[in-house]
A protein has these predicted regions:
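Class I SAM-dependent methyltransferase SAM/SAH-binding core
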Residues: 92, 98-141
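Conserved beta-strand signature within the Rossmann-like core of class I S-adenosyl-L-methionine
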Residues: 179-187
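A conserved beta-strand element that flanks and buttresses the S-adenosyl-L-methionine
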Residues: 153
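Conserved class I S-adenosyl-L-methionine
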Residues: 32-85
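Short alpha-helix
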Residues: 209-225
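Short catalytic micro-motifs in class I SAM-dependent methyltransferases
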Residues: 156-160
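A short glycine-rich, Lys/Arg-flanked "PGG" loop and its adjoining helix->strand segment in the class I
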Residues: 168-180
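Short, glycine-/aromatic-enriched active-site segment of Class I SAM-dependent methyltransferases
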Residues: 187-208
């Protein structure tokens, strides 16, 4: 918990005026900093992992997945804009990682704030996008006032979180700070890919048992948030 505060002080993403206008400053420890934080998320605090992260998406398959995800995000942006009849002034990308989609969000005409708990990933993002704002933040307790953000975007995150309690705490924070809604990458267990992995795990051919929520559980978690 103490380390989380130190990290915030080391990474000066909160010092930009535009972010300060939206933020409230406090110790960022929360449920997300307890022992139930998934070990997979800690991997991204490794400097080597952060430096090499973008290579995962540099091949043909990675680029294809990026294009597919970008289309889904843009479609969701359009639905939210049409539903509320407004143009978004700002967006929160969390966890932003190395800023893979920062340019995509900025192209929507709104100021994008990238947030992540990994300082190492944020350093890569700032190098790639020096004109944009990035800050170190715990998704379980975001340093923003209520409704300070127009729209939030959370991709490649919740499928790594096996605790329903922790997922709900993240969703509640997004609901609190996002005025018009959030775009969530929420993956469920009833897919051919996941069912195949479960079978391979049972046969000893896959090292980890997939622990994704069912579609029904996802609905319940969204309702609780």
């Amino acid at each position: 918990r103490r380390a989380a505060v130190i990290i915030l002080k080391e990474f000066n993403g909160l010092k930009t005026p535009r972010v300060q206008a939206l933020s409230r400053l406090y110790s960022c420890y929360s449920l997300a900093m307890d022992d139930i934080r998934p070990p997979k998320l800690e991997v991204y605090r490794d400097e080597t992992v952060a430096r090499d992260y973008d290579q995962r998406w540099s091949g043909a398959l990675g680029k294809k997945r990026d294009v597919r995800k970008a289309r889904a995000i843009l479609k969701a942006f359009g639905i939210l804009k049409e539903h509320h009849g407004v143009s978004f002034q700002n967006a929160l990308d969390i966890p932003c990682g190395t800023g893979r989609f920062s340019d995509l969000f900025d192209a929507q005409g709104c100021h994008t704030i990238g947030a992540d708990l990994s300082v190492e990933m944020l350093q890569q993002a700032r190098t790639k996008h020096p004109q944009q704002d990035f800050l170190c933040a715990d998704m379980g307790r975001l340093p923003f006032e209520d409704n300070a953000i127009d729209v939030g975007v959370c991709i490649r995150m919740l499928h790594l979180v096996h605790s329903s309690e922790l997922r709900i705490s993240f969703l509640r924070e997004l609901n609190r700070v996002c005025k018009f809604g959030a775009i969530i990458d929420y993956r469920h267990s009833h897919t051919v890919r996941i069912l195949s992995r479960k079978l391979r795990y049972q046969l000893g051919a896959y090292k980890e048992n997939p622990q994704l929520p069912s579609p029904r559980q996802i609905q319940l978690e969204l309702q609780q948030a």
